[in-house]
Amino acid sequence: MVEGLLAERGIDLCYETVRCWANKFGPAIAANTRRKRGRADSVWHLDEMVVSINGQRMFMWRAVDKEGEVLDVLVQKRRNKVAALKLLRKLLKNQGAVPKAIVTDGLKSYPPAMKVLGCVDRHQPGRLRDNNRVENSHLPVRRRERKMQRFKSQGQAQRFVSTHSAVYKSFNTQRHLVSRNTMRKFRSAAKAEWNAASAAAA
């Protein structure tokens, strides 16, 4: 798509060039975007899903707030206490505060990890429907995974989901729920946010 848009403007390049740009600038743009959004909401939703990477079964750990904003994504080989602890430590470091509640599914790896960090009292384990917000957050990645014919390595998967999760929220607007004028405002705000993040990454 990017290749076609640039071709219309007389710029000839191949998809490999676009891929290299994404690998080089994507992580920095994603980091700048997250930094400008500030601290997350006081309720976190955590979940993990299985992904196939080069024929190997791995797990994509994801955290979102109650507004659906992706806080972090980690691709890991295990679904155990150590993996849960790694995600929680990264979240606490980046957010700078313990949330009022941490909602998860029934995975038994979460309670011992939270006990280590002293936040087990914030844990709210629930049924699948109680964590629909983070479950729905997996769907865009599933769609991209199919289009990309699976991820080739853990590093590639981590780079993609980190960048995608930071940028997707800005440009994903439910058009059928807003007026045309509101849609224009959302797009202008998203473009301004993107320009600021990409300028800082250049």
Regions found by a protein language model. Give the residues of each.
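Short, basic alpha-helical nucleic acid-contact segments in DNA-binding proteins
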Residues: D12, C20-S42
